Design a protein with these regions (language model features):
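Alpha-helical segment proximal to the catalytic Tyr-Lys
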Residues: 134, 178-182, 241
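Substrate-binding pocket helix/loop in short-chain dehydrogenase/reductase
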Residues: 105-118, 213
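Residue(s) in the substrate-gating loop at a strand-loop-helix junction
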Residues: 149
Length: 258
């Protein structure tokens, strides 16, 4: 194996699909995969403008395409996969990143909210796996990555349904690792802590909430989308070729703090 960083962490020749790729962590991960040499399909809801994000990558000289896709809609998910295969003939890496925190303490529809998060964080990921794992395996193997959360590893006062469904999708990644490892597919979950994005603004933009969280974070700061994207490139590249069935925590040490 070539141990030079530009080879060890290269995704050249790969085709990657990133869901929830129009903004935030998903967009940073798509950009990092493209910079590492992958051809990237950026999928997202219409209001996140995945086509615009892809167009910016193309302007920079990368190969990318944007697809409007609600991953909870089976027909749209099938179209996403077929569009990718028709365009580039293969799939090597999946990052199932689409997500939403819909919990609202005291809400009368708490169970309905949990159902919606289950559909997004678990069922949609399972459906994407069903559509893409055979393609990845037939192409010689690759990486199926699931964006989980620190909330799936800790008890939560507020993010109850979010934490439950994120814990479930990390388990789904472990199951895929066992079921598909013999065909060359690696599956891992990634669990970010608080990352400075619009999604985390209720914590990062609230002085009291931010201070309370940082007291529990040994590194004393919030993470950046690029720091999550670095792990995605690692797991998709030759550098991550012997890593599977893991839940990679990127939280500045919050989980292990006393």
């Amino acid at each position: 194996m070539n141990l030079a960083p530009d080879s060890l962490f290269s995704c050249a020749g790969q085709v990657a699909i990133v869901t929830g790729a129009g903004t935030g962590i998903g967009r940073a991960c798509a950009e990092a995969l493209a910079a590492a040499g992958a051809r990237v399909v950026l999928a997202g809801l219409a209001d996140s403008r995945p086509e615009g994000a892809a167009a910016e990558l193309v302007e920079q000289g990368f190969e990318a395409v944007g697809v409007v896709c609600d991953v909870t809609d089976a027909a749209q998910l099938r179209r996403l996969v077929s569009t990718t295969v028709e365009r580039w003939g293969r799939i090597d890496t999946i990052l199932a990143n689409a997500g939403a925190a819909l919990d609202q303490p005291g809400a009368d529809d708490a169970l309905e909210r949990m159902d919606r998060m289950y559909a997004l964080h678990v069922r949609a990921v399972a459906a994407l796996a069903e559509l893409t794992l055979p393609v990845i395996a037939d192409g010689g193997g690759g990486a199926f990555l699931v964006m989980s959360s620190l909330s799936g590893l800790r008890g939560n006062r507020v993010l109850s349904g979010y934490g439950v469904t994120k814990a479930a999708n990390a388990q789904l990644a472990r199951n895929i690792a066992v079921q598909w490892g013999a065909r060359g597919v690696r599956a891992n979950a990634i669990s970010p802590g608080v990352i400075a994005t619009e999604f985390a603004a209720p914590i990062t933009d609230d002085a009291d909430a931010a201070a309370a969280r940082l007291l529990k974070t040994p590194l004393g700061r919030f993470g950046t989308p690029a720091e999550v994207a670095g792990a995605v490139v690692w797991l998709a590249s030759p550098a991550g070729a012997f890593v599977t069935g893991q839940n990679i925590v990127i939280d500045g040490g919050t989980l292990i703090s006393d």
